[in-house]
Amino acid sequence: MTEVVPRTVLYCGVCTLPPEYCEFGGAFKRCKAWLEDNDQELFAQLYSVEALTNAVQASSISAEKQEEIDRKLQKQQQKDEAKAERELLKKLASKVVIKRIERSKRKRIISVSGLEVFELDLKKLSKTFSSKFATGASVTKTADGKEEIVIQGDVGDGVEELITQMLKEKGLNQVKVEQIDEKKKKKE
């Protein structure tokens, strides 16, 4: 019996699709530049002048329709790139708020809000907090519909360090992480 050798497939470093499908994604220009840097042969096979003229001749679409399709595709790609840039600016403009809330006597809880913008799984993050700090941690909804992580105990400094480290790993160094003390008003 002959041994079957698995095929190796190259995936784009930008959109994670095979390079043949990059043109259908939102970041075609960046994908094309990545392919040119990483695999010259495949780039020449897909995007050389000969390959493009052969593709146009093989298709039954008229030149005018092809130009219209190209224009629409380019417009869509520009919209997608602008959207990605807006999302990045939104992430950089947002801030993470760590509140230290006094409960009774010497008991405190830490409330972490503003993390939903960064597309983090808050349940996994609360599990990480509870195992790292050996306390209870849960995800709750606030009055305005956003989610926050509530951690039992006074571990605000450790939470701040962990969050800044996680944001640095994602390449978001400019995000503000601030701590706020919220004290209960005494009854008179």
Swiss-Prot record:
Predominant location category: cytoplasm
Cellular component per GO, a single term: ribonucleoprotein complex
Cysteine-cysteine disulfides: none
Molecular functions per Gene Ontology: translation initiation factor activity
InterPro entries: DENR/SUI1_TIF, DENR_C, DENR_eukaryotes, DENR_N, SUI1, SUI1_dom_sf
Superkingdom of source: Eukaryota
A single GO BP: formation of translation preinitiation complex
Residue span(s) of domain SUI1: 96-167
Subcellular location: Cytoplasm
Keywords tagged on the record: Cytoplasm, Ribonucleoprotein, Ribosomal protein
Free-text domain note: The SUI1 domain may be involved in RNA binding.
Similarity remark: Belongs to the DENR family.
PANTHER family listed in its UniProt record: DENSITY-REGULATED PROTEIN (PTHR12789:SF0), DENSITY-REGULATED PROTEIN HOMOLOG (PTHR12789)
Subunit structure: Interacts with the 40S ribosomal subunit.
Name of the protein: Translation machinery-associated protein 22
Species assigned in the record: Yarrowia lipolytica (strain CLIB 122 / E 150)
